[in-house]
From Swiss-Prot:
Pfam families: Forkhead. It comes from Homo sapiens (Human). It comes from the Eukaryota. Disulfide bonds: none annotated. It is found in: Nucleus. Residues 1-29 have a biased composition (Basic and acidic residues). Residues 108-202 bind DNA. This is Forkhead box protein D4-like 3. One of its GO terms (cellular component) is chromatin.
Length: 417
């Protein structure tokens, strides 16, 4: 700002202190002061013109603490002269409605989700509600959850599924709608202290039933079969039925009752694959039923597992071998009677023989050469039954038809076709 003034002073000729007459005159101090005032006015006008050219036309915005200033305030002197005027015109924007509403947000209730669900179920006259009904009760009762509805609905669903105090009740066919009902377990009524939902007294756990407690089988079944035979009853259902005594498991059985009333679904196949031998039954008259065999004492889990492996190996030939062996036992001799169920040992040319009771190894029957003209026995089902006891009759070999004698092993086997 001082440089133009200095150049101008240099360019102006120096005034002489002498008059035209050559005499010394007085110094004109006032004239110099007027010249200085004119120079300052010119400089202010030039700076004002420069500012007007740099600014855009219309409303000019200047950053003054994040507030927009009009153009007249910029041209008037670069800022407001009065601080009070600046405070009244340029105040901070008011807070939004959402911010003020957040300030008045209600507090979260001091209840857990289990307590909220229990409240909703107990206020219902039928003491049961669906998931949507529980959420509707909580939203209508507590404004805090009304504002945040979609967020806590999954928490209610998880608490219903994971806690044993809540029981799912299927919807009846005659009642249309969506979703199952949820109710409280009757044994969980003392879960809260004196009806106060602020704190639970204890965590409720539903009692688990031991699998295999009511098994009607002589041998324990696997877990999957035990679950099918003995499903766990629900808590809202009646008390479970008393366990039925396992037949043959206790020595003191009622008179007239057979100890092993329930056997394998296929008795003949089960007897052929089992290692221990039944004890001999007393002889009876021809046509009388065979006495019930006594329970075999040497049955162990390891033996049952080994027999199961052998049964899987010979699964393909088991059906045909069982039918042949059963018919040979029935048609063995003319005057000979069966004194007990014994296994058949394979012989090379179709001859039959029995194993002694002290022989512990399992004799696996093998298929014998068949006659080309003899069809398989059609009436095998007459001798095999799925009941608890097996009744068999013996008949002389001479009274049998030729086909039966051929299958019984009395006729000479022919060359296979």
């Amino acid at each position: 700002m001082n440089l133009p003034r200095a150049e101008r002073l240099r360019s102006t000729p120096q005034r002489s202190l002498r008059d035209s007459d050559g005499e010394d005159g007085k110094i004109d101090v006032l004239g110099e002061e007027e010249d200085e005032d004119e120079v300052e006015d010119e400089e202010e006008a030039a700076s004002q013109q420069f500012l007007e050219q740099s600014l855009q036309p219309g409303l000019q915005v200047a950053r003054w603490g994040g507030v927009a200033l009009p153009r007249e305030h910029i041209e008037g002197g670069g800022g407001p002269s009065d601080p009070s005027e600046f405070g009244t015109k340029f105040r901070a924007p008011p807070r939004s409605a959402a911010a003020s509403e957040d300030a008045r947000q209600p507090a979260k209730p001091p209840y857990s989700y289990i307590a909220l669900i229990t409240m909703a179920i107990l206020q219902n006259p039928h003491k049961r509600l669906t998931l949507s009904g529980i959420c509707a009760f909580i939203s209508g009762r507590f404004p805090y959850y009304r504002r945040k509805f979609p967020a806590w609905q999954n928490s209610i669903r998880h608490n219903l599924s994971l806690n044993d105090c809540f029981v799912k009740i299927p919807r009846e066919p005659g009642h249309p709608g969506k979703g199952n009902y949820w109710s409280l377990d009757p044994a969980s009524q003392d879960m809260f202290d004196n009806g106060s939902f602020l704190r639970r007294r204890k965590r409720f756990k539903r009692h688990q039933l031991t699998p295999g407690a009511h098994l009607p089988h002589p041998f324990p079944l696997p877990a999957a079969h035990a679950a099918l035979h003995n499903p766990r009853p629900g808590p809202l259902l009646g008390a479970p039925a008393p366990p039925q005594p396992v037949p043959g498991a206790y020595p003191n059985t009622a008179p007239g009752r057979r100890p092993y009333a329930l056997l394998h679904p296929h008795p003949l196949r089960y007897l052929l694959l089992s290692a221990p031998v039944y004890a001999g039954a007393p002889k009876k008259a021809e046509g009388a039923a065979l006495a019930t065999p006594a329970p075999f004492p040497c049955c162990s889990p390891h033996l049952v597992l080994s027999l199961g492996r052998r049964a899987r190996v010979w699964r393909r030939h088991r059906e045909a071998d069982a039918s042949l062996s059963a018919l040979r036992v029935l048609c063995k001799g003319s005057g000979e009677r069966v004194q007990g169920l014994r296994r058949i040992c394979p012989r090379p040319r179709g001859a039959t023989a029995t194993c002694s009771s002290d022989h512990q190894a399992c004799c696996i029957p093998r298929p014998l050469p068949l006659c080309c003209k003899c069809p398989p026995p059609p009436l095998l089902g007459q001798f095999c039954s799925n009941s608890s006891s097996i009744r068999r009759r013996t008949a002389p070999t001479a009274a049998l038809p030729p086909r039966a004698r051929c299958w019984a092993g009395t006729c000479r086997p022919r060359r296979p076709c």
